[in-house]
Amino acid sequence: MDGQNLLYWQERIDLAAAFRWAARLNMHEAVANHFSLSVNEDGTQFLMNPNQKHFSRIKASDILLLDANDPDTMQKPGAPDPTAWGLHGSVHRKCPHAKCVMHVHSIHATVLASLADSRLPPIDQNTAIFYERYVIDEGFGGLAFEDEGMRCAGMLQDPKIKVMIMGNHGVLVLGNNVSDTFNRLYYFERAAETYIRALQTGQPLRELPHDIAAKTANELDDYPDQAESHFSELKAILDDEGSNYSS
């Protein structure tokens, strides 16, 4: 472990736990996908997973500390994945309110993103979490190198937007910290699964009216300590199992 890896240690531990659980819940994809967490006020200093390492093996000491404004990042030893840099660097540079950014190609979110109509209607409590809180990117332009990353970041300027359904691609989830963001990612995948399975029945959907969907979303926004308790329990499970995620 070098000196850099001693910085933001608790934040690294939280990210490592999120990677481990994303893999356990099958929200990962080979050695692709990426999570990041800003550690300064303007969001330009951020932590992110190393290039080409499986989520199930990432430890706190593996996580990179990057500067979104450093033009030489990709030429340095141990450079991040170029699409991770293009997407997350752009979001942290342009959207300082997005403290934590999680991008995956999880199965149900990606199925939703592959439909001609990628809207997520409020048909239960979990889908209602995201009512009027997501944006659909319908302009997929290839891999998320710098230009594509900047285009995506331009759609996330409104702090109310917590999820980007990335058409033909996957999902991008934003939050205030690791627990908030991972909890949102977990529930988005569950919500997408519920919707996809409901569509598979071929039966009409029981969609909530606008006022009830909006009320439910607001109530869930304010639900006390749910994300923190969820993530604390996930870390406790890893600790009980003797996982090395926090090393």
Task: Please name every model-derived segment.
Residues 1-247:
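Glycine-rich flexible loops
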